[in-house]
């Protein structure tokens, strides 16, 4: 619809005044020629990258990863850091739980010599450090482990047993308002690890909830629910965990998809195992009996030998990965893989 000429002039004058006062790019038309695609970082799991719909976690956004104890939350974030560092990005780890193991991080491929690490005394200090790193524009990925360990200063200075109702929720709510804009401007990915608590007296629906109030649920562009669903065994020895991740919230693609992969102890996500499975599923790798073949050449008898061949031939592995991403990310179906409980999707509780 054509706009009246006088209105057009008035709009142009208003836009000019806004850009003069607040800087170029402070207001623009949504369809203007600028990058509409969200830049992403791989999670280290091919199936999870595909479930997210954009090929990874989005830059400039807030992401929440939550789940029970020993479900793989920290491992997943360390894999994200390793993937980001391989792309030459700068990463920071805010270790509020004081439990980061540098030896394990190195095994997962993290360059610990170039990883910024902070062990803050209070929750306010941790969030101020996050904000300062985001405003610097020099840090690409920040991980906070975990929201439950972000203890307000008043609680630390008080005595055990004192009531501090809603302090952590208010602190998080204030921090989210401040952080969201700074993260977008600096294109920094901020990942919060969170723990699960049980709501008392819930008769119907999901009794589980996450700590730190409701603000994080609203501000997060992606929320991932990670669970251990089984054990990976070699003979009688348990060598890893079968893991399922549900995309509970997704603002960059269709939500409610899920991914399943293995986390091997001391190694991290079994990426090459996923590559073999997805390659066979998409008919990029041929499977006849126990033999696996690629481009007509046999690459191994049994999955373990096929994985070994891919590790020894990184160029072929990269080629298969690229083809899988092109096939599955370009043909994303907007229909959810599954439905979540109403409590997972609902975010209408009172914000502190």
UniProtKB/Swiss-Prot annotation:
The UniProt annotation puts the region (Disordered) at 333-352
GO cellular component term, pick one:
cytosol
**Which Gene Ontology molecular-function terms are recorded?**
ATP binding; ATP hydrolysis activity; ATP-dependent DNA damage sensor activity; damaged DNA binding; single-stranded DNA binding
Enumerate the Gene Ontology biological process terms: DNA recombination; DNA repair; SOS response
Keyword line: ATP-binding, Cytoplasm, DNA damage, DNA recombination, DNA repair, DNA-binding, Nucleotide-binding, SOS response
What SMART domains would the database entry show? AAA
For binding ATP, which residues are annotated in this chain's numbering? Answer: 67-74
InterPro entries reported for this sequence: AAA+_ATPase, DNA_recomb/repair_RecA, DNA_recomb/repair_RecA_CS, P-loop_NTPase, RecA-like_C, RecA-like_N, RecA_ATP-bd, RecA_C_sf
Mark out the compositionally biased spans (Acidic residues).
343-352
What's one Pfam family the UniProt record gives for this protein?
RecA
Where is this protein localized, as stated in its record?
Cytoplasm
The UniProt family comment states: Belongs to the RecA family.
Q: What does this protein do?
A: Can catalyze the hydrolysis of ATP in the presence of single-stranded DNA, the ATP-dependent uptake of single-stranded DNA by duplex DNA, and the ATP-dependent hybridization of homologous single-stranded DNAs. It interacts with LexA causing its activation and leading to its autocatalytic cleavage.
UniProt-recorded name of the protein: Protein RecA
